[in-house]
């Protein structure tokens, strides 16, 4: 076997890791990248969708680039928890910095304000990336493989329930009736997010760090880069996983950051609709986790990736369909005016919230399943190197919207998501022996029966 499926379970770490994830998900809801942040950037810049794409790209690339340079560094360290603590302090400081810049900036769009905010979002994401390998290494060494799906699923389930409450709070804070106008409303959102993230980081900072198998010598960066393509050539599962992630990045970058701008600009929805979308996403996310974690633990992460990828095809497709629906009035929804077109469009946030945890759990655990422990940092680091250029796809999406409006971007997102689905059906399940699965070619998703939820 390539990984130890019988790693002992450290119950203290398991519990603290769940608390960490639950509070982190709640914190993230107050600055959710596909709902809150696009609306914030539109308000900050006066409506420029290219700036929405740039901020989305900076956040994503901030998550990727440190992994490229830190893979070899972490592979020689027996103590990883201090790096997680430092990175968490940086993240909280960056969010507080954003709140301060927005609070004390002059009224109206200003280039320096946008650059400062965008730079701090990049710092926030980069600090998170610094803690990524320590976090996953500690988690992986604290529990057996067949408990990871339940672990991440429980984090997402309970965190999703708190995120529903966060969505209600976001709607109230952004509502005109609340009395807070821009930028004070977003200053409050970012301040709440910073406080909750500090609590989340504090929980994981007191875990008991397990023993790690480390490399005796740090490989030079060129050697890490050379090792990555070799892993990609030799490991079919790794290669297919990276293709699916690439298609998924194109799908997400073409539509994800621009769903809320579409609602605000084309459907003429009020700002408070962001909170309603967030509630829908959080409810779908929380509801999905019982299913995703059970599939991952009992049927394997390959099956999890297939079903979550199938669900991920729907958001952009629904948004595309909504363009053909008439804007007939239907009454109110969450206290907001509702039209038939907005109602159909809002359905896109159900599969968006439903698919995201499955993709996160499946991709993370599948990569941990196929990566031998001593090469784990090389697998993780090179995977981010491959994905780094595609982090800037939201800028391409913004340019497409600027010339052909939203329809072409949503169509491209649907096609790319379908390509990601076809790719994951070709994966082999690395835990097939433990799960009692036959090594057979995967049937098409449409020919499988839907797994029972747990």
Roles of regions detected by a PLM:
Residues 37-44, 72-76, 99-108, 162-184, ...:
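Transmembrane alpha-helix termini and helix-breaking/packing motifs in multi-pass membrane transporters
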């Amino acid at each position: 076997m390539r990984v130890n499926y019988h790693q002992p379970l450290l119950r203290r770490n398991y519990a603290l890791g769940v608390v960490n994830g639950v509070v982190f998900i709640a914190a993230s809801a107050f600055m959710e990248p596909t709902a809150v942040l696009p609306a914030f950037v539109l308000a900050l810049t006066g409506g420029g969708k290219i700036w929405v794409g740039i901020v989305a790209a900076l956040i994503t690339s901030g998550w990727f680039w440190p992994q490229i340079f830190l893979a070899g560094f972490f592979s020689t360290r027996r103590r990883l928890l201090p790096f997680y603590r430092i990175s968490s302090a940086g993240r909280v400081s960056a969010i507080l910095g954003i709140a301060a810049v927005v609070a004390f900036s002059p009224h109206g769009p200003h280039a320096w304000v946008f650059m400062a905010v965008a730079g701090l979002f990049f710092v926030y994401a980069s600090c998170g990336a610094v803690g990524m390998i320590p976090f996953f290494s500690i988690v992986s060494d604290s529990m057996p493989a067949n408990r990871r799906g339940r672990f991440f699923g429980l984090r997402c389930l309970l965190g999703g329930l708190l995120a529903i409450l966060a969505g209600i709070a976001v709607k109230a804070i952004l509502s005109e009736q609340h009395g807070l106008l821009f930028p004070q409303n977003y200053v409050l959102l970012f301040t709440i997010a910073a406080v909750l993230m500090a609590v989340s980081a504090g929980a994981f900072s007191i875990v008991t760090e397990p023993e790690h198998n480390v490399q005796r010598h740090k490989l030079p960066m060129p050697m890490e880069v050379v090792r990555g393509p070799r892993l990609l050539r030799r490991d079919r599962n790794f290669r297919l996983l990276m293709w699916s992630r690439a298609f998924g990045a194109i799908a997400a970058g073409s539509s994800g950051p621009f769903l809320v701008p579409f609602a605000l600009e084309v459907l003429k929805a009020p700002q408070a609709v962001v909170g309603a979308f967030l509630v829908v996403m959080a409810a779908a996310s929380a509801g999905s986790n019982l299913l995703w974690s059970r599939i991952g633990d009992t049927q394997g992460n390959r099956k999890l990736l297939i079903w979550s990828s199938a669900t991920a095809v729907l958001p952009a497709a629904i948004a595309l369909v909504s363009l053909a629906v008439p804007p007939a009035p239907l009454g109110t929804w969450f206290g907001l005016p509702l039209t038939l077109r907005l109602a159909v469009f809002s359905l896109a946030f159900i599969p968006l919230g439903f698919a995201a945890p499955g993709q996160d759990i499946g991709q993370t655990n599948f990569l941990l399943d196929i990566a031998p422990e001593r090469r784990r940092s090389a697998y993780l680091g090179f995977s981010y190197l491959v994905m780094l250029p595609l982090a800037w796809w939201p800028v391409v999406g913004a340019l497409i919207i600027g010339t052909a409006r939203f329809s072409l971007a949503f169509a491209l997102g649907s096609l790319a998501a379908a390509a990601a689905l076809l790719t994951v059906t070709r994966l082999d399940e690395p835990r097939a022996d433990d799960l009692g699965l036959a090594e057979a070619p995967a049937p098409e998703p449409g020919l499988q029966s839907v797994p029972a939820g747990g």
